Amino acid sequence: MFKLINNFFNLSKNDLLKKNTLDIQKNFPVKKIFDAIKSFSDESDIYYVGGCVRKIFCHELVDDIDLATNINPDEVILSLKKNNISFYETGKNHGTITAIIDDKKFEITSLRKDISTDGRHAKVLFSKDWREDAERRDFTFNSIYSNIDGEVFDPFNGRKDLENGCVTFIGDPSKRIKEDYLRICLLYTSPSPRD
C-alpha cells in the first residue's frame, strides 16, 4: 500500500514537472532552440539545466533559461545559423553561446569537464558525457537536467535535496570551493528550496 501511495505522489510530481516545462514553452520561444540543436545530428541533444530546473521544482517563476548540449560551441553556432537564430559568443572558450529570440536570451553551454582550475576560472575540455558535466557543477540541485518534455536526468539526487531543503555540494566541498572561490558565496546566497 505504501508503495502504491508513494508511486502516486511521484507520478504527481512528474506530471507537475511536465506541466511546468510546457508552461516555459508558452512564455519563452525555447522550442525553436531545442529543434535547432537536435537538427545538428542524430546524436545531438539539449536539456534545461541549473537554476531554471531548480525553479520549476520549487514552483518559482522561471525568469531565465540555461541549456546544456552535447555538441561543441562551433556546432551550436552552426545549428543556430542554419535555423536563423541570432546569437553572440558569451564565453565560447568555456562553451557558452547565447541565443536570442524575441529579445529573450538563452545561454547554451556545451557539456564539459575541467582540466585545470585557478580558484575562479577553469580550463575546460568539451565532452559528450552528461554525468561528467554534472560532476563539475557546484550543488546537487544545479545538476538536474530536464528535456523539453519534463523527463529528468538527476545523477546526484538534487531533486531529493530540494525536497528536503538541503544545499549539498557535489563531491568534496573543500575541493569544490578551491576550484572556484565564488562557490562559497553561492553557498550562502543560494535560496532555500523551502522558502
Task: Give residue spans per PLM region.
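Catalytic cores of the polymerase beta-like nucleotidyltransferase superfamily
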Residues: 1-190
